[in-house]
Amino acid sequence: MNFEWDAHKAASNLAKDGIGFEEAALVFADSRRLTLVDARHQTEIRENTTGMIAEILIVTVTHTERKGVIRIISARPARKRYHAHDS
């Protein structure tokens, strides 16, 4: 998989949520990840993928796909409702 992101947004995300986009991309290696369409956005298809990084951190990554490249928009620790993913 190929990834891209805006460098300023990545720095802002790291400062706000403590997760870098390079680290967030590891969610896509989790075979148990869950991806849902984010219906709030109508200008492009955005998805939220929740999965584990290094078997210790559950993260939700908001992303879109452009010309076969996954563009990471944001990443944050998953909310409690997603922690059932690990059961």
Outline where the language-model segments fall.
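Ribonuclease/tRNase effector modules and their secretory precursors
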Residues: 1-87
